[in-house]
């Protein structure tokens, strides 16, 4: 074995880091840390007493609590929706499984802020749904703004992160373990809890992490739903020259993000891989086969039908206006160009980091 491949191992993984990927990963890490270092440097300039005063203000504490509640509730809702949907579309004889597999993944193509605009237009004050119910004497609908509405919107457009990762894990899982559990007279719920959940837990944790980070970083949806979270308040403070408050809130946001990453790693634990024959026998839903379609259709319909219907109504209204709607091709070109460039950079930057983390043991790859 030559010198380049003669490496130590740690629990089956090599421990001697290759020079090229290490330099690339270090460069990526440095680029990511530059904004954080600027925040820390600027935060030190605020002064200890001023920082304590700003961070302990009731409004600052309210923003922290609002953000924590939004992330916790939305992530929990995404798991509660995504995992059952994945199980139904992979492991059961749900009718039209292929159709529902696509339908419940489609909310990813709708930006959450577009969904927020659509829901406010439909269910907000004097919205389309309220006008529809006005002849029946309904003068006001429950308030859609605030925490509840924001959780609803973000859940509808981020649960696919959990669904897709859980579905991939369920499809690759060795179901002979489930068959073995059933032969030991475990019922379906106990089999799911003791066999299925431990195997899909890393995938579910990864999907929940994506949902949580999306919620934490989202600016458009909380702004439309009039709910003060880190991103919205930081933007307002920077715009009004409240740089000290914005910097301290940004540092809080970074700290919360690090905590979420740590928590995900603890929940995920060590990833499990199974080998052997795979049984593709589906779970028979029996008399619940067709009723099980109702919650699946409700989730997909709420996330897709409402925004599409509102957008079509706007399009129809614009066709009769004096200045009909025209397609802004320059905006579309800019969006596609920026998205493609960002995706390419993300892939190039992510490969060395992912390679080192997955291939080599030790703490340093984990730091990258």
Which residue stretches match the model-derived regions?
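Membrane-water interface segments at the C-terminal ends of transmembrane alpha-helices
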Residues: 14-46, 58-170, 199-219, 245-262, ...
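A short amphipathic helical element positioned immediately N-terminal to and/or at the very start
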Residues: 48-56, 320-323
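Hydrophobic positions on the alpha-helical face of helix-turn-helix-like DNA-binding modules
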Residues: 180-181, 191, 195, 234
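Glycine/proline-centered hinge or cleavage motifs at structural transition points of membrane proteins
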Residues: 184-185, 198
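Peri-membrane helix termini and adjoining interfacial loops of integral membrane proteins
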Residues: 2, 40-52, 124-136, 225-231, ...
């Amino acid at each position: 074995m030559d010198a380049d491949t003669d490496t130590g191992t740690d629990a089956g993984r090599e421990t001697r880091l290759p020079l090229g990927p290490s330099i690339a990963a270090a460069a990526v890490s440095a680029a990511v840390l530059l904004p954080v270092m600027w925040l820390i440097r600027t935060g030190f300039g605020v002064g200890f007493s001023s920082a304590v005063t700003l961070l302990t203000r009731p409004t600052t504490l309210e923003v922290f609590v609002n953000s924590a509640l939004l992330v916790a509730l939305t992530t929990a809702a995404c798991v509660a929706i995504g995992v059952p949907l994945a199980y139904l579309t992979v492991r059961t004889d749900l009718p039209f499984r292929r159709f529902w597999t696509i339908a419940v993944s489609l909310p990813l193509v709708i930006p959450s802020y577009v969904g927020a605009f659509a829901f406010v237009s439909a269910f907000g004050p004097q919205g389309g749904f309220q006008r529809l119910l006005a002849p029946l004497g309904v003068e006001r609908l429950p308030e859609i703004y605030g925490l509840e509405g924001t959780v609803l919107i973000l859940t509808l457009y981020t649960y696919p992160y959990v669904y897709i990762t859980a579905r991939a894990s369920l499809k690759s899982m060795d179901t002979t373990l489930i068959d073995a559990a059933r032969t030991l007279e475990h019922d379906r719920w106990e089999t799911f809890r003791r066999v299925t959940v431990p195997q899909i837990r890393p995938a579910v944790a990864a999907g929940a992490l994506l949902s949580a980070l999306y919620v934490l970083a989202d600016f458009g949806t909380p702004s439309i739903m009039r709910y003060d979270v880190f991103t919205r308040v930081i933007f307002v403070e920077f715009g009004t020259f409240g740089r000290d408050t914005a910097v301290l809130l940004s540092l809080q946001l970074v700290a919360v993000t690090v905590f979420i990453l740590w928590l995900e790693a603890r929940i995920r634990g060590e990833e499990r891989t199974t080998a052997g024959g795979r049984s593709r026998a589906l779970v028979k839903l029996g008399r619940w086969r067709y009723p099980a379609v109702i919650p699946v259709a409700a989730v997909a319909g709420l996330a897709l039908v409402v925004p599409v219907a509102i957008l079509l109504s706007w399009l129809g209204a614009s066709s009769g206006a004096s200045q009909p709607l025209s397609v802004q091709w320059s905006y579309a070109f800019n969006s596609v160009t920026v998205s493609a460039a960002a995706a390419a950079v993300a892939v190039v930057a992510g490969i060395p980091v992912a390679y080192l983390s997955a291939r080599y043991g030790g703490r340093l790859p984990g730091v990258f």
